[in-house]
Design a protein with these regions (language model features):
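Short strand-turn-strand beta-turns centered on an Asx-Gly dipeptide
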Residues: 74-75, 117, 137
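Charged, cofactor-coupling segments
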Residues: 124-130, 134-152
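Short, surface-exposed, charged/polar-biased interaction segments
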Residues: 36-43, 119, 130-133
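Catalytic-core "active-site belt" of small-molecule-metabolizing enzymes
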Residues: 1-90, 141-147
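A conserved acidic, glycine/proline-rich C-terminal tail/linker
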Residues: 91-126
Length: 152
């Protein structure tokens, strides 16, 4: 969550200085691409297949976000792991690009805004009754449970 607004150009340090808190999140994707296989250009044009986001608790610190480890569990089984480096080298790197693109449109990131910086692990299917949980640095957890499909 941004504590300060960001406009025009900002480097990685300026982006991080504007961030008040970083949160454990799960991105829910809804891809039109079979098997979640696509070209980068197509996925970008499709809004990155983003459907929803589950925002969990704040991480203890915004320092060294590129080193924060995450383990993803799908129905209790580990399905992937990564560090913040999986987001273009650093989670704030995409925000540097976003700030520049918004400035071209006369817009900016406002204080209070939350920006999702991209998935760190591969996507997993989320079927009825599934539970997906991410554990950040062995402590901070966020989970989503998809309820059963109603019957008629």
């Amino acid at each position: 969550r941004f504590e300060h607004s960001l406009s025009a150009r900002a480097d990685l340090d300026e982006v991080l200085a504007a961030v008040g808190q970083a949160f454990a999140c799960l991105e829910i994707v809804d891809s039109v691409y079979p098997g979640y296989r696509f070209r980068l250009e197509d996925n970008t044009a499709d809004g990155s297949s983003a459907a929803q986001v589950v925002v969990g608790p704040a991480l203890p610190s915004i320092e060294h976000l590129d080193e924060v480890g995450v383990v993803l569990f799908h129905n209790g089984a580990e399905s992937g792991s990564a560090t913040g480096r999986a987001a273009s080298g650093h989670p704030a790197a995409g925000v540097v690009w976003l700030v520049e693109q918004l400035a071209l449109q006369g817009r900016r990131i406002e204080a209070g805004d939350i920006v999702i910086t991209g998935g760190l692990t591969r996507a997993v299917p989320l079927a009825a009754r599934d539970v997906v949980e991410a554990v950040f640095d062995g402590a901070t957890r966020v989970a989503v449970h998809r309820p059963p499909t109603p019957t008629r």
